């Protein structure tokens, strides 16, 4: 008799199961439950403004200039002269229209309120040590440089702004009306710097205009630099007396403007009576990013955000209010985003005894196996020992590396978009550095959609890569098992030996050696001879005789039936002779 011994177990590749699924969005599959996620967004809360980490942050233009507005510093008010520290980031903290505590200025006739903002846009700012024009000998002179009691100096004597010289005709001979005169404004800063030149003109009542300049008619003024030309006509009379910062009341007004001269470029000013000629100029270089905020600056932060203040970046993206931000900032997106950090969610697969082997294999592909500690992909063994599970850490690490690569790619996308957002702001450093909100919002919406699509595609790739990892596991398993197992499909192999938890752990660790496990012995035929005993026929012998007789009878009957069939078909003739 032949006896065959089977010790076969079945080993399959598989994916872990989880009882706490999360949901991610994908490009083609919609929302998919996965075993883990990496949140990519946060919703910040409002905080105070802070110094930007890793760089100098400028609050007031001149921190040591007490009781001075930034416009006072920018115009060179006598009591507000000081050093402006260098900075790569600046806070636009004066949100209301700001005046200067000196001679009354008609701020709304020019862009002069933007001058402090312009200066904030530079990293390095210094006031020249000498004057750009000799005001006393300028065309239309000689002049005396006028001062005012409403603009006291540090000794409380009469003074005036350091950036301008009030050119008053020196004697009665030149206190007359004049045709437009032109003066060149040379570039006196260092090569590579921008020169910001401040100038203006004085207007007063008809009586005062005649007294100071010999002409009561409106005067014309023009400035030109870098292809930008600006025209003004003075307004005569009709001003109520006004005092600034406790100074003497004044019936007159001054109009102040500025021009930006690029390195080596000359500017021109065409004027009549009442000119405020340029004197000391601002020399500026480098770029400092400007953002609206508030003082004081408390502590440090990764990012400064107009709506939320100082933020420390914990996620690459944020939801909530969109606004301008500078520094190492998250990018605004419309909806929360999550990156898949695991496998597609599968409920625990049913055991063999519940579904049968092939049913369990199908369930294994549809479901997952519990017990793969610290791993997403691995192996299961089915046999007399029950079900053993072991995680394959290498394939799990490869999956994690792919997710990390996706995360880094999204971070690179974030940096590029951040540069794109701030780039336009840098290019407008000669202006107030504010973009139209509608244009900015449209740009933000576009970038948000790009980022959301990138995350959807990343999730799609991560989830779809499960098949790739399982196929790699299957090839690895097949190579390790070698001739000790038979491939039965669906990522499963039937082994010719037992494979318990120890065996499975070695497979997962890549140290499996089939020779260490006992292979089964196959006896192709085990024949036991029958023998006659002295006691006569035993049961085995009787059974043998019975079998022989029954077989002979069956053969005889079959032959007889065949002959009868052939005769009936006339294929065989039968002759009987006596």
Swiss-Prot record:
Any Pfam family matching the protein: Hemagglutinin
UniProt GO MF annotations: host cell surface receptor binding
Membrane-spanning segments: 547-567
Cytoplasmic side: 568-578
Disulfide feature: 12-492, 68-80, 102-151, 499-503
Keywords: Disulfide bond, Fusion of virus membrane with host endosomal membrane, Fusion of virus membrane with host membrane, Glycoprotein, Hemagglutinin, Host cell membrane, Host membrane, Host-virus interaction, Lipoprotein, Membrane, Palmitate, Transmembrane, Transmembrane helix, Viral attachment to host cell, Viral envelope protein, Viral penetration into host cytoplasm, Virion, Virus endocytosis by host, Virus entry into host cell
Glycan-bearing residues: 33, 67, 153, 174, 312, 341, 500, 526, 539
Modification(s) after translation: Palmitoylated. In natural infection, inactive HA is matured into HA1 and HA2 outside the cell by one or more trypsin-like, arginine-specific endoprotease secreted by the bronchial epithelial cells. One identified protease that may be involved in this process is secreted in lungs by club cells.
Extracellular topological intervals: 1-546
An individual GO BP term: fusion of virus membrane with host endosome membrane
Main location: virion
Lipid modification (S-palmitoyl cysteine), residues: 574, 577
Function summary: Binds to sialic acid-containing receptors on the cell surface, bringing about the attachment of the virus particle to the cell. Plays a major role in the determination of host range restriction and virulence. Class I viral fusion protein. Responsible for penetration of the virus into the cell cytoplasm by mediating the fusion of the membrane of the endocytosed virus particle with the endosomal membrane. Low pH in endosomes induce an irreversible conformational change in HA2, releasing the fusion hydrophobic peptide. Several trimers are required to form a competent fusion pore.
Subunit and partners: Homotrimer of disulfide-linked HA1-HA2.
Family (UniProt): Belongs to the influenza viruses hemagglutinin family.
Name assigned to this protein: Hemagglutinin
Phylogenetic lineage: Viruses, Riboviria, Orthornavirae, Negarnaviricota, Polyploviricotina
């Amino acid at each position: 008799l032949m006896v065959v011994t089977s010790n076969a177990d079945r080993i399959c590749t598989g994916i872990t199961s989880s009882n706490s699924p999360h949901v991610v969005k994908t490009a083609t599959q919609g929302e998919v439950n996965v075993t883990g996620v990496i949140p990519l967004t946060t919703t910040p809360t409002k905080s105070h403004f802070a110094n930007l980490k890793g760089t100098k942050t400028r609050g007031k233009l001149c921190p040591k200039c007490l009781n001075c507005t930034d416009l006072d510093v920018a115009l060179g008010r006598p009591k507000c002269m000081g050093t402006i520290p260098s900075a790569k980031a600046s806070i636009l903290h004066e949100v209301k229209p700001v005046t200067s505590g000196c001679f009354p200025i008609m701020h709304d006739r020019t862009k002069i309120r933007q001058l402090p903002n312009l200066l904030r846009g530079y990293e390095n700012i210094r006031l020249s040590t000498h004057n750009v024009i000799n005001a006393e000998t300028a065309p239309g002179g000689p002049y005396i440089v006028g001062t005012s009691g409403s603009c006291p100096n540090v000794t409380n004597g009469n003074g005036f702004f350091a950036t301008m010289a009030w050119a008053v005709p020196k004697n009665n001979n030149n206190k007359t009306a004049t045709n437009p005169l032109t003066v060149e404004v040379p570039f006196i800063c260092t090569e590579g710097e921008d020169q910001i030149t401040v100038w203006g003109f004085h207007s007063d009542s008809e009586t005062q205009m005649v007294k100071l300049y010999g002409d009561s008619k409106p005067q014309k003024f023009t400035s030109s630099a870098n292809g930008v030309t600006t025209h003004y006509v003075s307004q005569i009379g009709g001003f109520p007396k006004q005092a600034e910062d406790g100074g003497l009341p004044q019936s007159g007004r001054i109009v102040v403007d500025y021009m930006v001269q690029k390195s080596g470029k000359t500017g021109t000013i065409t004027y009549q009576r009442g000119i405020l000629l340029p004197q000391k100029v601002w020399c500026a270089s480098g770029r400092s990013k400007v953002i609206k905020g508030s003082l004081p600056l408390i502590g440090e932060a990764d990012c400064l955000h107009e709506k939320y203040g100082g933020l420390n970046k914990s996620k690459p993206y944020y939801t909530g209010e969109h606004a301008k931000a500078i520094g190492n900032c998250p990018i605004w997106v419309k909806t929360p985003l999550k990156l898949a950090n695991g496998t597609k969610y599968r409920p625990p697969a049913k055991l063999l005894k519940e579904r049968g082997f092939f049913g369990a294999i199908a369930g294994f592909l549809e479901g997952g196996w519990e017990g793969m500690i610290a791993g997403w992909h691995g192996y299961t063994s089915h046999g007399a020992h029950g079900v053993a599970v072991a995680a394959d850490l290498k394939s799990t690490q490869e999956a994690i590396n792919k997710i990390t690569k996706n995360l880094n790619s999204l971070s690179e996308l974030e940096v590029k978009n951040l540069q794109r957002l701030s780039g336009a702001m840098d290019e407008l450093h000669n202006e107030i550095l504010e973009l139209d909100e509608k244009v900015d919002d449209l740009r933000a919406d576009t970038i948000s959609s790009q980022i959301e699509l990138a995350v959807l595609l990343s999730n799609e790739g991560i989830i779809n890569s499960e098949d790739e990892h399982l196929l790699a596991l299957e090839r690895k398993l097949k190579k390790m098992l070698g001739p000790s197992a038979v491939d039965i499909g669906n990522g499963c192999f039937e082994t010719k030996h037992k494979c318990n938890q120890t065996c499975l752990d070695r497979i997962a660790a890549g140290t499996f050696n089939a020779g260490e496990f006992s292979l089964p012995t196959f006896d192709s035929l085990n024949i036991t001879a029958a023998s006659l005993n002295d006691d006569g026929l035993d049961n085995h012998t009787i059974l043998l005789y019975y079998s022989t007789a029954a077989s002979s009878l069956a053969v005889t009957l079959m032959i007889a039936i065949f002959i009868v069939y052939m005769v009936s078909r006339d294929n065989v003739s039968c002759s009987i002779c006596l």
